[in-house]
Amino acid sequence: QMPILSLFNLIIAASGTCGYGQEAAKKYNLNHLGSLVLKSTTLHPRQGNPRPRVCETSAGWLNANGLQNVGITAATNEKIPWLRKNYPQLPIIASAAGFSEDEYVKVVSEFANTAGVKAIELNVSCPNVKHGGMAMGTDPEVLQRLVKQVVKAALGIPIYVKLTPNVTNIVPLAQAAEQGGANGLTMINTLTGLSIDLKTRRPALANVTGGLSGPAIKPLALRMIHQV
């Protein structure tokens, strides 16, 4: 049970890991999931960062995809209808990203008017883009204002705010999201990290830094959840 959202089970595929579901469905029965969080989607399509974008570390993975996605039009007209047709019982959680308050509101509004979307995750914590993303999720005042506008655009659909761990204190951001009207929080996004290719003596990722995920960040995530 999540705030205003009932699931078959609590196994949820996190945003990004399964794209929009089509690729993952070739290897895995999506009906076994409690829900699928779609890849974070922006107003316009994005090619993402230069390659290589992903590398393995000793305790997880670094990625710097740079919000590569098909854009809101393709997501709502093609990707979500495919999921609804092939997995009609699977609750879909969309993920909205943007580079301004106006973009976030437009993306959320489109998702809110798309059949099959049961909740919307607000990604204000992507560490792999130059503007927007994490920049809007590190200032409590800015975040609270953004969440208020997004909640209005969501037309009653639950909003879960994905918080960045790349701050000194995550608690004020969680409070700002709550005060803005968020129904819940997603904790946490990846931690900014860097890996060196020992053969080339250069960063393993073309973007230099990337977001660290995997076993290494679980204790940090649990600590932040406890703080909140």
Description of each model-found segment:
Residues 1-92, 97-99:
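N-terminal capping/small domains of soluble enzymes
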Residues 10-12, 35, 91-95, 117-121, ...:
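Structural preference for beta-strand elements that scaffold enzyme active sites
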Residues 16-21, 95-107, 158-184:
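Active-site glycine- and acidic-residue-rich loops that bind
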Residues 28-29, 112-113, 178-181:
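Non-catalytic positions within long, well-ordered alpha-helices that form the structural scaffold/packing
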Residues 61, 69, 127-139, 173-176, ...:
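Glycine/Thr-rich beta-alpha phosphate-binding loop at enzyme active sites
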Residues 72, 76-81, 104-112, 140-151, ...:
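Generic structural signal for well-ordered alpha-helices
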Residues 109-153, 161-164:
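Metal-dependent enolase-superfamily TIM-barrel catalytic cores that perform enediolate-based chemistry
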